[in-house]
Amino acid sequence: MGGGGPPARVQGTEGSQTGGGAVAVSYHPNNLDTKPLSCLPILSNFLLISSNSSLTSSTSSPLLMSSRYASAVEIPSSSAYSSTNSIVASLSRIDTTSFELLMVSRLRSSTPGKPFCSVPSVA
């Protein structure tokens, strides 16, 4: 069960705000040339692929989370956090050298066009 090389990177693709696409963001603190997480539309589902398997609670919509070498696990919407700000804080607290965030572009109808802002601080 060896390494087998680095995991595949999620390629960034622009998704339409009406759905039907995907917004993929990769953030690597050790690579300053990589684009950090920025303001994105609030999406109903998103997949966080992290080098650790810590679970982050979801908003009112399901959150998919997995480690790099494990299958994605869907966290029920009845998790602890209930606001997008909590999700942003949780993403910033993840202790890992790199993680990739894949958001499925399904805007929440309650807040169309509202930005999902998350810019982790790099020391």
From Swiss-Prot:
Protein origin, superkingdom: Viruses
Organism per entry: Halorubrum pleomorphic virus 1 (HRPV-1)
Ranges where the record places region Disordered: 1-24
Protein's name in the database: Uncharacterized protein 9
Lineage: Viruses, Monodnaviria, Trapavirae, Saleviricota, Huolimaviricetes
